[in-house]
């Protein structure tokens, strides 16, 4: 972060603008809009400056800049076309510890003025830190088109209601739900857009009189395989509205960083072979949180209905009449294979794909003869500890020992590792990776040499992506 983003309260504060041309005019408008007491210093001024001065909106000081003009000033802007003058303004301001902006000169600037989207009291600032001002302008234009003009009226209404809401609703959860209803109320927004404040007030009163349900709910959300960019839009909306987020080990830190900041977070991580929190206890946590009236998100890696025990958790909630819904996620098989350049199906290689759990606790549960059939791709979840058994059973039931395999560790993340080889090497390969890892078996693995797009990109933000290939000696 090259610049610390901050909004300054400049009402009735003395500011100095050095320069009297058209560029200085634009800066003066911003300072006047902010309520600053503006003094402008220049040898010549545009007619607009004289008009402002005649109206008593600012003061003009004609002549060369001298450091004494900085006395009692909160900040200064240099907007002349003379480099020596701008440099003197900056040096003088810096010596007196006054923030100074020199237009189009990042090296002589202690604060920058971003592109602004003004929906007062909502203010949005966009800055590239002086690196790409045109890009900042384009972003501002996109945001201008997205944000309705009545947004400021809605914010002003919310500000006027804050004390009343605080008195009306004792619990913080109730207040937040009221605000969410008010700020997403379509008819209220339309009334404000039409400047129909009578109708808007009626909608507000209806919201105050309507009972806020204290019945909680649970939303089962798939977080995807790791890359936060693979989280669905609906999943993002849910984690940003949650009162409580119950999450496990497979949810990446990048996804957790998107959770609403004041939401309670409950970690129930579990690993193959042992559970940090027993499944029965997880069920009880979800039940108790929902029964207390909270909006609960059960956040699971990948897709919650594919080896995620999501169905078991919802069965428990259904038995108690707790409302629930499901937001599917990109499952690990899809994400890891795509980021490894391995298509799960291909006309020349596989006409079907099977998703298989690799840590079934009872022998004989898997139909190894069918799994060893040709023209299909196998994806084993949680299979590292059983890699030797998988290798032995597939070869024993007729799958060629030379069948291609790949193990994907931390798939789709910047720490992704892919180890590949032949089925006869699977047990050995499994010792080179750690959990979470996915095992892909099938001739489609051979395509990764052509389609391996992710690790072949040498981005600075992906330094950990590595590839390993084992060869039969």
UniProtKB/Swiss-Prot annotation:
Region entry Precorrin-2 dehydrogenase /sirohydrochlorin ferrochelatase, spans: 1-204
Residues at the active site: 248 (proton acceptor), 270 (proton donor)
Residues reported to bind S-adenosyl-L-methionine: 225, 301-303, 306, 331-332, 382, 411
Ranges annotated as spanning the membrane: none
GO terms, biological process: cobalamin biosynthetic process; methylation; siroheme biosynthetic process
InterPro entries, alphabetized: 4pyrrol_Mease, 4pyrrol_Methylase_sf, 4pyrrole_Mease_sub1, 4pyrrole_Mease_sub2, CobA/CysG_C, NAD(P)-bd_dom_sf, Siro_Cobalamin_biosynth, Sirohaem_synt_dimer_dom_sf
Chain positions with Phosphoserine modification: 128
Known EC number: 2.1.1.107, 1.3.1.76, 4.99.1.4
Source taxon at top rank: Bacteria
Residue span of region Uroporphyrinogen-III C-methyltransferase: 216-473
Alphabetical list of HAMAP family matching this protein: Siroheme_synth (MF_01646)
Family from the record: In the N-terminal section; belongs to the precorrin-2 dehydrogenase / sirohydrochlorin ferrochelatase family.
Physiological role: Then it catalyzes the NAD-dependent ring dehydrogenation of precorrin-2 to yield sirohydrochlorin. Finally, it catalyzes the ferrochelation of sirohydrochlorin to yield siroheme.
UniProt protein name: Siroheme synthase 2
Species annotation: Yersinia pseudotuberculosis serotype O:1b (strain IP 31758)
